[in-house]
Regions:
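Positively charged n-region of N-terminal signal peptides that target proteins for export
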Residues: 1-7
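Bacterial N-terminal signal peptides
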Residues: 9-20
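Bilobed "Venus flytrap"/periplasmic-binding protein-like clamshell domains
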Residues: 28-56, 61-64, 116, 120-185
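N-terminal secretory/targeting leader peptides
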Residues: 31-34, 38-39, 49-76, 80-83, ...
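Second-shell loop/turn segments in exported
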Residues: 32-39, 65, 111, 142-147, ...
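Acidic, polar ligand-binding/catalytic clefts
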Residues: 83-118, 196-200
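Pocket-lining segment of extracytoplasmic ligand-binding domains
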Residues: 90-92, 100-102, 130, 165-264
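Segments of small-molecule ligand-sensing domains
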Residues: 247-299
Length: 299
């Protein structure tokens, strides 16, 4: 009886060893990839990487896209390892590394940039007959300022504070799609975005209203914004990007970066970059959103 029992134990133990070291039982490296709120490009990046067939078929890496408030939340979660990878604006990476985030002296030194993704411009949407032609005309108005914790919100606060209007508007913290809906229902006079164009939320707003984009470039230039925050670049949102907006609109932009926690294995970072920045991978990303035409090995 003892011999039979001993033999059974040996068989069970051997089976456990086989299952533990069998090829199919090798644990996958789990990558939580932080995106952003609905209606924004950050989440399109995360989803696009997750659903790419070559990534889905990896035997030793599992990528899971996760929604978030946006850039600032992604910076913090990637730094503490709750997210292994994410999309963060370059300005927030720089401010975080140097302990200069607003009301946050912590230095976020565990976040490493691994690739440039695309330029993300500021966009301020108003109704064509609103009389709002400058940021300063927003005083007393109801404005969608982005999700709390997002890069859009942080950059809106930064710019509007610089322009002297942050404390003089009725602020509504909400995502882009919610803001577009509220704008269409006359619950907002304007809404701010910090995302690649064309934005689905602005397209939605233009379907129900005649819209204009405020010339943020002129405001930034005249106020010395570019000198105060040199990591922002100048650009024009081309005429025809949105229905009814028939002239180029000057603005400013930050760069969206693919970042990783410093403890993510080098081979995991390399493999995902290799797949996404391949000819097939870049074609897949452009299929998710035309903005990703900017992605290339040269950038």
């Amino acid at each position: 009886m003892r011999k039979s029992l001993f033999s059974a134990v040996v068989v069970v133990a051997a089976l456990a060893l086989v299952l533990t070291f069998a090829p199919g039982a090798v644990a996958k490296e789990r990558v939580i990839f932080g995106g952003g709120p609905a209606g924004g490009t950050f989440q399109v990046v995360a989803n696009g990487i997750q659903v790419f067939d070559a990534v889905k078929n990896l035997e030793n890496i599992s990528v899971k896209a996760q929604t978030s408030a946006g850039s600032v939340e992604n910076l913090r979660k990637t730094d503490d390892g709750k997210q292994q990878m994410s999309v963060v604006y370059s300005g927030h990476v720089w401010l975080g590394r140097n302990g200069k985030m607003k009301n946050d002296p912590k230095k976020y030194e565990n976040v490493m940039a691994v690739a440039w993704l695309y330029g993300a411009p500021a966009q301020l949407v108003v109704k064509k007959d609103s009389g709002i032609e400058s940021t300063k005309d927003l005083v007393g108005k109801k404005v969608g300022v982005g999700n709390a914790g997002s890069g859009a919100f942080a950059n809106c606060e930064l710019f509007f504070t610089h322009m002297g209007v942050w404390d003089k508007i009725e602020r509504n913290a909400m995502g882009y799609n919610d803001a577009a809906a509220a704008f269409g229902n006359n619950q907002l006079d304007a809404f701010w975005l910090f995302t690649a164009f064309p934005s689905g939320a602005v397209i939605m707003a233009a379907q129900t209203n005649d819209i204009s984009l405020v010339d943020l470039g002129a405001d930034a230039e005249a106020s010395g914004f570019f000198k105060a925050y040199p990591y922002f670049g100048k650009l024009n949102i081309p005429a025809g990007t949105y229905r009814g907006v028939d002239t180029d609109t000057p603005s400013f932009q930050d760069s969206a970066l693919w970042v990783a926690n410093k403890d993510v294995p080098d081979e995991v970072v390399f493999k995902l970059l290799e797949l996404i920045y391949s000819e097939e991978g870049l074609k897949h990303m452009v299929g998710q959103k035309k903005t990703f035409k900017e992605m290339s090995l040269d950038t």
